[in-house]
Amino acid sequence: MFRTKRSALVRRLWRSRAPGGEDEEEGVGGGGGGGGLRGEGATDGRAYGAGGGGAGRAGCCLGKAVRGAKGHHHPHPPSSGAGAAGGAEADLKALTHSVLKKLKERQLELLLQAVESRGGTRTACLLLPGRLDCRLGPGAPASAQPAQPPSSYSLPLLLCKVFRWPDLRHSSEVKRLCCCESYGKINPELVCCNPHHLSRLCELESPPPPYSRYPMDFLKPTADCPDAVPSSDETGGTNYLAPGGLSDSQLLLEPGDRSHWCVVAYWEEKTRVGRLYCVQEPSLDIFYDLPQGNGFCLGQLNSDNKSQLVQKVRSKIGCGIQLTREVDGVWVYNRSSYPIFIKSATLDNPDSRTLLVHKVFPGFSIKAFDYEKAYSLQRPNDHEFMQQPWTGFTVQISFVKGWGQCYTRQFISSCPCWLEVIFNSR
């Protein structure tokens, strides 16, 4: 009976693997954009699997790597390609089964719970020996065809490849979430192998592609900037300013105020919904509908907006995003099934006078804010910048819908549902 249950768990896990492989998924996320951060106008509202896997989805965030791979691609005849794909699938299945059968029943149950939840609920760490090496290819038990050199995966990487991102190749492409016990540990004896405790790393090309550019002058307040709106008691003395057009924000702090590290405002088009949300914990979940959710629930806010587009986008926010303050800056993890769009002064080339809007696919993380870079961008020796408040401590995030040159929405205030994250500069 014990063996029967374990075998059933293994079969159930294999049936829950991420759909598609590299060839099947190529170009899925590119839409009309090809392979970079350009031309997402046709795909801004497309849903993706909870894992956010697939070469196409990685392509828009890791465009340079994907283009390099395509440049060295040599097409195979259909029969040859199908045979190679079938062999790779068989190898991966054999390797995965051999690894899973080494796990205890309780470990298999924890892994299955994490995989079937698709990151919608907080699941426990799955701690396994970190030195276990999985080889796929010649020399490995799973391989019979010596056509290519063997691929070696750590156990966490293998499980991420099987259950989230079939095109995953290297550990440098993933980032461990701060909620994980293995976060920040180097070569531990036991490492967490929960595939939903890692995210796909969104790397930006250098220099950034010409997508959704904004003049840096828009960072400066305009002459018709309205008066400051008095803050509520929960903002810790934060005054909120909304310059015309872009609705950018500035954080004005009372001396000695260290009660929060950022403030979050939720907007529907040009209307702010609910109060400003002060963030004191290092991690915050922002979601609309999340099982066992703990954080900023947008679904509990009272909104009078009757727009069908707003209501449609609101229903797609789902698990939303995770905002975390870490040693190197502030990271945003897209937990939803749809892309998010981010604009931040610290994501761009400091010598550029333009800002970009960056598209982040489901399952990906991006370092949305860098404190050190933000301080350097203040240009303390620049007389013009010293005379006016600066908005570089603000990040704007739109759910599902993008804005900029590739869209009819030129400004984020035209987006149905979006966030403004205002960082404490002290």
Curated annotation (Swiss-Prot):
Coiled-coil portions: none
UniProt note on tissues of expression: Ubiquitous.
Protein name: Mothers against decapentaplegic homolog 7
Alphabetical keyword list: Acetylation, Cytoplasm, Isopeptide bond, Metal-binding, Nucleus, Phosphoprotein, Transcription, Transcription regulation, Ubl conjugation, Zinc
GO biological process: adherens junction assembly; anatomical structure morphogenesis; artery morphogenesis; beta-catenin destruction complex disassembly; cell differentiation; cellular response to leukemia inhibitory factor; intracellular signal transduction; negative regulation of activin receptor signaling pathway
Region: Important for interaction with SMURF2, residue numbers: 208-217
Region Disordered, annotated ranges: 14-40, 67-88
One GO cellular component term noted in the UniProt record for this chain: heteromeric SMAD protein complex
Annotated Basic residues bias: 67-76
Role summary: Antagonist of signaling by TGF-beta (transforming growth factor) type 1 receptor superfamily members; has been shown to inhibit TGF-beta (Transforming growth factor) and activin signaling by associating with their receptors thus preventing SMAD2 access. Functions as an adapter to recruit SMURF2 to the TGF-beta receptor complex. Also acts by recruiting the PPP1R15A-PP1 complex to TGFBR1, which promotes its dephosphorylation. Positively regulates PDPK1 kinase activity by stimulating its dissociation from the 14-3-3 protein YWHAQ which acts as a negative regulator.
Cross-link (Glycyl lysine isopeptide (Lys-Gly) (interchain with G-Cter in ubiquitin)) at residue(s): K64, K70
Record note on modification: Phosphorylation on Ser-249 does not affect its stability, nuclear localization or inhibitory function in TGFB signaling; however it affects its ability to regulate transcription. Phosphorylated by PDPK1. Ubiquitinated by WWP1. Polyubiquitinated by RNF111, which is enhanced by AXIN1 and promotes proteasomal degradation. In response to TGF-beta, ubiquitinated by SMURF1; which promotes its degradation.
Segments of skewed composition (Gly residues): 28-39
Subunit structure, interactors included: Interacts with COPS5. Interacts with STAMBP. Interacts with NEDD4L. Interacts with RNF111, AXIN1 and AXIN2. Interacts with PPP1R15A. Interacts with ACVR1B, SMURF1, SMURF2 and TGFBR1; SMAD7 recruits SMURF1 and SMURF2 to the TGF-beta receptor and regulates its degradation. Interacts with WWP1. Interacts with PDPK1 (via PH domain). Interacts with TSC22D1/TSC-22; the interaction requires TGF-beta and the interaction is inhibited by TGFBR1.
InterPro entries tied to this protein: Dwarfin, MAD_homology1_Dwarfin-type, MAD_homology_MH1, SMAD-like_dom_sf, SMAD_dom_Dwarfin-type, SMAD_FHA_dom_sf, SMAD_MH1_sf
UniProt domain MH2: residue ranges: 261-426
Residue numbers carrying N6-acetyllysine: K64, K70
Organism: Rattus norvegicus (Rat)
Pfam families: MH1, MH2
Signal peptide: none
Domain (MH1): residue spans on this chain: 64-207
PTM sites of type Phosphoserine: S249
UniProt: Zn(2+) binding residues: C125, C180, C192, H197
Subcellular location: Nucleus; Cytoplasm
Domain of life: Eukaryota
Gene designation per UniProt: Smad7
